[in-house]
């Protein structure tokens, strides 16, 4: 990541909105923003393979559900945050991931400029591709600051998105069971 370019761009934005980049409260802002972007965009170019490839053998194929995984990310359209909770269900095929690995999967894909629909897809596809799940179902609930702070200005509005892969695509009863276990 080119932090010098980020700092220069932030200085230009500060000046473009009519502020003084040398004002005491703004002098270190370009460097702070560059460091922040390094952190919140640390998922760029990464996948969840390293997390989901560390799995454990299991003899049954009962559904695994992990819900209320908090995340935050940046909307790629306005570069404003959106945040919320991800709920994951999957059907193992002989292997299960450690529970923290599901949260890490959400984290990897949320640490970049993102849209909610793609975040759903990337998490579900990672479970299928890297864990070898028989099915994956991901529900994400999020509030978007681009809708709360600007535009229609409707704070508190939740957007829900879902994606189903494998067994969840064809089995409505399985999806319904996942919804119930997720409390949705």
From Swiss-Prot:
Keywords: GTP-binding, Hydrolase, Metal-binding, Nucleotide-binding, One-carbon metabolism, Zinc. Its EC number is 3.5.4.16. Belongs to the GTP cyclohydrolase I family. It comes from the Bacteria. InterPro entries: GTP-CH-I_C/QueF (IPR043133), GTP-CH-I_N (IPR043134), GTP_CycHdrlase_I (IPR001474), GTP_CycHdrlase_I_CS (IPR018234), GTP_CycHdrlase_I_dom (IPR020602). This is GTP cyclohydrolase 1. Zn(2+) binds at residues 75, 78, 146. Pathway: Cofactor biosynthesis; 7,8-dihydroneopterin triphosphate biosynthesis; 7,8-dihydroneopterin triphosphate from GTP: step 1/1. It catalyses: GTP + H2O = 7,8-dihydroneopterin 3'-triphosphate + formate + H(+). One of its GO terms (biological process) is tetrahydrobiopterin biosynthetic process. GO terms for molecular function: GTP binding; GTP cyclohydrolase I activity; zinc ion binding. PROSITE patterns: GTP_CYCLOHYDROL_1_1, GTP_CYCLOHYDROL_1_2. It is an enzyme of class 3 (hydrolase). Homomer. One of its GO terms (cellular component) is cytoplasm.
């Amino acid at each position: 990541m080119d932090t010098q370019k980020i700092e220069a761009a932030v200085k230009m934005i500060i000046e473009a909105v009519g502020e003084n980049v040398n004002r005491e409260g703004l002098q270190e802002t370009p460097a702070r923003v560059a460091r922040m972007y390094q952190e919140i965009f640390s998922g760029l170019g990464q996948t969840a393979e390293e997390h989901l490839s560390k799995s454990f053998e299991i003899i049954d194929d009962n559904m695994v559900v992990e819900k209320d995984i908090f995340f935050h990310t940046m909307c790629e359209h306005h570069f404003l945050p959106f945040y919320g909770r991800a709920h994951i269900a999957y059907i193992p095929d002989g292997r299960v991931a450690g529970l923290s690995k599901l949260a890490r999967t959400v984290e990897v894909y949320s640490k970049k400029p993102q849209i909610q629909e793609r975040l759903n897809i990337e998490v579900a596809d990672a479970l299928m591709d890297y864990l070898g799940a028989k099915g994956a179902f991901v529900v994400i609930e999020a509030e978007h600051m681009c809708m709360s702070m600007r535009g229609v200005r409707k704070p508190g509005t939740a957007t829900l998105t879902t994606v189903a892969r494998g067994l969840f695509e064809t089995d409505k009863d399985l999806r319904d069971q996942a919804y119930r276990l997720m409390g949705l």
